Regions:
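The feature encodes the CheY-like receiver
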Residues: 21, 63
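Charged docking surfaces used in two-component/phosphorelay signaling
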Residues: 22-30
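A generic structural motif
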Residues: 32-35
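Active-site residues of response regulator receiver
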Residues: 59
Length: 63
């Protein structure tokens, strides 16, 4: 992976399971991505309204 480009990529993780959310966040942060998380759709929608993310990882089974 080209880690120089990863520095500038911002990713939003939307996951209600804390252990999975933390694992994804730590893994991506280790690769030098800027990572934000949300555990509800509402929280994610507020973050999306304020910032344009390069990638959103969304739990499709979110309650």
């Amino acid at each position: 992976m080209d880690t120089d480009k990863a520095i500038f990529m911002k990713i939003l993780i939307v996951e209600d399971e804390p252990s999975l959310r933390e694992l994804m966040q730590k893994t991506l942060a280790k690769e030098r991505y800027v990572v934000e998380t949300a555990d509800t759709f509402y929280e994610a929608s507020l973050k999306i309204a304020d910032y344009s993310y390069d990638c959103i990882l969304l739990d499709i089974m979110l309650p």
